[in-house]
Amino acid sequence: MASTLKFIVIVPAAGVGKRMQANCPKQYLRINNETILSHTVMRLLSHPLISQVIVALGTEDQYFAESELAHHKDIIRVNGGTERVNSVLNGLKAVDSDKYPWVLVHDAARPCVSHQDIDKLITRCLRKDYGGILATPVRDTMKRGVLIKDSAKGDNTIIESTVEREQLWHALTPQMYKTDELTLAIEQALENSLKITDEASAIEQANLPSLLVSASSENIKITHPNDLALAEFYLNKQANNTN
C-alpha cells in the first residue's frame, strides 16, 4: 500500500486477565516460547508503516523489564490506568500529534492480527478521512437474555428476544482515529462519566463516524485458557504461509 505517513500504535497492557486463571498476567503467557505481548508488539512493529508502539503497563508490572521488549528502541513504556480507557489516554498523552496525526490502538492479547487487515484499515480511514475499526459480521443467531432471580430454585438467564443480526458486528482491534479527536473524545467521555469499552465507543459519544472494516476471524482475543491453543494454531499457520 502507498502512504507517506507513519503510524504509532498504543497497546494497553495493564490488565491481569483473571479469566485465564494463570499465575501471571495473560499477556506474559508464552506461545512458542515467546510472550503473547511480544508476539503482538513485534507483529505491529514489523508492519512497514508502523514506526513505534506505546505499551501501557500496570504500575506493579514485574514482567516487562525482564522481557525481550524492554530495551527495544521503538517501544515506549507508559503507566497504565485503572481501566483500559485510562491506559489508552495515558498513551495518547505520550503521542506527538504533529508527528503522528493518526493513532491506532490494539489489544495486547490479539497477537494474530495480519498485516493485510492493518493495511485495509489504514487505507480505508485515510481515504474517508475519519476513523474506523477492524470488525467481523455476526454470523450466529443472537439472543437477548434476562436474569430471573429465584431464591428457591436458583437464578437463571432466559431468552427475552431474538436480536436481528444483519447489522451487528464484533468489534476487534486495531481501532484507528485521528490522535487529537480520540484524545478529546475520551477526555469528554470520562468527564461525563460515560461507559467507554473501546475507542469506538468514545468516538460514538462524541457523535463522530466510525468505519467498520471487515477483518479476518483469525484476529482472536486471548481471553480463556482454550484460546491459547487456537492462537498458537493461527500463529503457526501464518508463519508457514509467509515461508
Curated annotation (Swiss-Prot):
Gene3D superfamilies from the UniProt entry: Spore Coat Polysaccharide Biosynthesis Protein SpsA, Chain A (3.90.550.10)
User: What pathway is this protein a component of?
Assistant: Isoprenoid biosynthesis; isopentenyl diphosphate biosynthesis via DXP pathway; isopentenyl diphosphate from 1-deoxy-D-xylulose 5-phosphate: step 2/6
Which CDD domains does the annotation name?
CDP-ME_synthetase (cd02516)
Q: One Pfam family, short name please?
A: IspD
Keywords, A to Z, come to: Isoprene biosynthesis, Nucleotidyltransferase, Transferase
InterPro entries reported in the protein's UniProt record: IspD, IspD/TarI, IspD/TarI_cytidylyltransf_bact, ISPD_synthase_CS, Nucleotide-diphossugar_trans
> Which Gene Ontology BP annotations are present?
isopentenyl diphosphate biosynthetic process, methylerythritol 4-phosphate pathway
Enzymatic class: transferase
By its UniProt entry, which PANTHER family does this protein fall under? 2-C-METHYL-D-ERYTHRITOL 4-PHOSPHATE CYTIDYLYLTRANSFERASE, CHLOROPLASTIC
The Swiss-Prot or TrEMBL record describes its family as follows:
Belongs to the IspD/TarI cytidylyltransferase family. IspD subfamily.
Protein name, entry field: 2-C-methyl-D-erythritol 4-phosphate cytidylyltransferase
| Organism of derivation | Colwellia psychrerythraea (strain 34H / ATCC BAA-681) (Vibrio psychroerythus)
